[in-house]
Structure formats: C-alpha cells, structure tokens
C-alpha cells in the first residue's frame, strides 16, 4: 500500500506550494487515474511515491517503508516504477535490450537473471522483436513501451505513469493503453496521470486534484456524475457523458452517471424502443 498522510511540498526556488495537505491511500493492485488542471500538483505527487521527491511535512509510506528514511529508499524505488511523460528522459541504453537491462544491472544481479528479466519484460509489453533495435530508430510509442519494459524489469509492485499517451497517435495510444490494462490484470498497481477523460473513465478509481489538494476521489461513475464541480475547475467530461447530459437537458429520461459506451447504448436503444412504440 502507498499511504500519504497530510503531505506538503514546496518548490523553494519558485516559491510554489505544490502539495497542500494531501492524504491518500492506494491499495495494491489498484488502477487509479490522477486528473486535474495543469499545475495542480499531479506530477509532483507521483514523484513522492518512489522517493524522487520527499515531503517537507507529512509522511509517505510505501509497503510500510517511510520515504524519508534513506535506508529504505532503494527498496521503495524497486516497489514503485516511474514512467515519465517524455521517455527520452529515462532511456539510457543504445539498444532496447541494453536499456531494459540497465535497472537490473544496477541491482548487481547475476547475468543470467538480468537476461531473463529483459526477455520477460519485453515479452510482457509485446516488443520482443525490438530487442536489438537502436533506440534512435524507434517511434514515440515504441519508446514509451521500452520505458515501461525498463520499469517492469525491476519487478515493481506499482507503476506510476505520467501521461503515457501524450503526443502519441491513436494507434500508438491504444497499444500503450492495452499494455497498461494487461499489466493491471496481472496484478500490477497502476497510477495513471491523464488529461484524457475517456482514459480515466476506464480505471477503477479517479482522484481529481486542484491547487495542490485532493478535490474529488471516487469511482469513474461517482466522479463524472459531479460534472458541475468538474467544470468549475475547467475539467472536461468523457464524450459519452457529455452526450448523455445533452440528451437529459433536451428532456429525455437518461442517466448521466454512465461512463461505459456499452451502458450508454443500452439506454439509447431503450429510448429508441419507447419512441418506436
């Protein structure tokens, strides 16, 4: 479990108080979307999960370890893998397999174990065929998958991803999201920063941040039912939710707390049947 208790963080040089009393519990195996306006503290928050940043007050514990204790920080970073928004900021190898091997090599694991982890990680994200490819020859989506594979080679309990589909075309975005869903189904906890509300709607839980605080916390259905509160802070809704709201505003008896396309289709077909009668 990742546990934050009244966490504050300030960027001293800029004088920006980025986190203001964050209390949050993230369970093992949970798939959580973190959303909110630009500058609300999302990236700052996830960097506390693996001790890249340390709170100026309050407490963060991961697997029972306090991130402020140096003796636990290596273990914490093995428990929580981080995938940055720009994969070029974390890819260090010349080839795909060299990069994925970098983390296990730093753990000073036996060569056979390193090779095993590399093969397994590449297979889990579906890029085994890229093993000997030069990093410079990869697409943006492929680099994102290499970054995820590099994290997986460390065998983390959680992966925190900062906008994993940013700047990707629809096909590459779909591929990355399928891999994320697959990893979650295998028991990996996923913390997923996104500005795409359709992506957020597919997770188990959404935490909305605003001005360094937790603004809302609940299931996708609970969060998007509070569309007035979301719009107050400039947030959009999933397209399907927007459609249902417009139908309701036009006088049709539809529910607006639906986020799944299949559930929306059931409602629309039901309405069509009533009009037909």
Protein language model annotation of sequence segments:
Residues 35-37:
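The feature captures the beta-strand-to-loop junction immediately N-terminal to the Walker
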Residues 151-152:
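ABC ATPase C-loop
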Residues 58-68, 76:
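Conserved ABC transporter NBD signature motif
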Residues 212-213:
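Conserved ABC ATPase "signature" C-loop
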């Amino acid at each position: 479990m990742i546990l934050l208790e009244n966490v504050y963080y300030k960027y001293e040089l800029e004088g920006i108080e980025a986190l203001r009393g964050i209390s949050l519990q993230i369970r093992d195996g949970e798939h959580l979307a973190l959303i909110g306006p630009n500058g609300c503290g999302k990236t700052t928050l996830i960097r506390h999960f693996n001790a890249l940043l340390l709170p100026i007050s309050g407490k963060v514990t991961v697997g029972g370890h306090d991130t402020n204790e140096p003796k636990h920080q290596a273990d914490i970073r093995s428990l929580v893998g981080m995938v940055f928004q720009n994969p070029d900021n974390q890819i260090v190898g010349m080839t795909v397999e060299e990069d994925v091997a970098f983390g296990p090599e730093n753990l000073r694991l036996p060569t056979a174990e390193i090779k095993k982890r590399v093969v397994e990680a590449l297979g889990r994200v579906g890029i085994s065929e890229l093993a000997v490819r030069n990093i410079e020859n990869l697409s943006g989506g492929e680099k994102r998958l290499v970054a995820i594979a590099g994290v997986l080679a460390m065998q983390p309990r959680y992966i925190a991803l900062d906008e994993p589909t940013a700047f990707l075309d629809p096909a590459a975005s779909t591929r990355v999201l399928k891999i994320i869903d697959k990893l979650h189904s295998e028991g990996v906890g996923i913390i997923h920063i996104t500005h795409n509300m359709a992506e957020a709607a597919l997770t188990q839980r959404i935490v909305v941040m605003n001005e360094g605080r937790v603004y809302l916390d609940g299931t996708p259905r609970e969060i998007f039912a509070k569309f007035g509160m979301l719009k107050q802070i400039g947030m959009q809704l999933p397209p399907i939710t927007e459609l249902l709201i417009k139908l309701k505003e036009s006088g049709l008896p539809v529910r607006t707390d639906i986020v799944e396309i299949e559930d929306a289709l059931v409602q629309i077909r039901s309405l069509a049947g009533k009009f037909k009668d």
